[in-house]
């Protein structure tokens, strides 16, 4: 899980999800693409 100020989708399987006011990126193909804004 990377914590970044600006989250971007890194591949076509990445999805931007907002949970409890926190913007996250989840990816089904590569778990290294997981990100959280913070």
From Swiss-Prot:
Gene Ontology MF terms in the entry: structural constituent of ribosome
Pfam families the record matches: Ribosomal_L36
An example Gene Ontology CC term for this record: cytoplasm
Superkingdom: Bacteria
GO biological process, one term: translation
InterPro entries with a match to the protein in the record: Ribosomal_bL36, Ribosomal_bL36_sp
PROSITE patterns: RIBOSOMAL_L36 (PS00828)
UniProt entry tagged with the keyword Transcription: no
Keywords: Ribonucleoprotein, Ribosomal protein
Family (UniProt): Belongs to the bacterial ribosomal protein bL36 family.
Protein name per Swiss-Prot or TrEMBL: Large ribosomal subunit protein bL36
Species of the source: Baumannia cicadellinicola subsp. Homalodisca coagulata
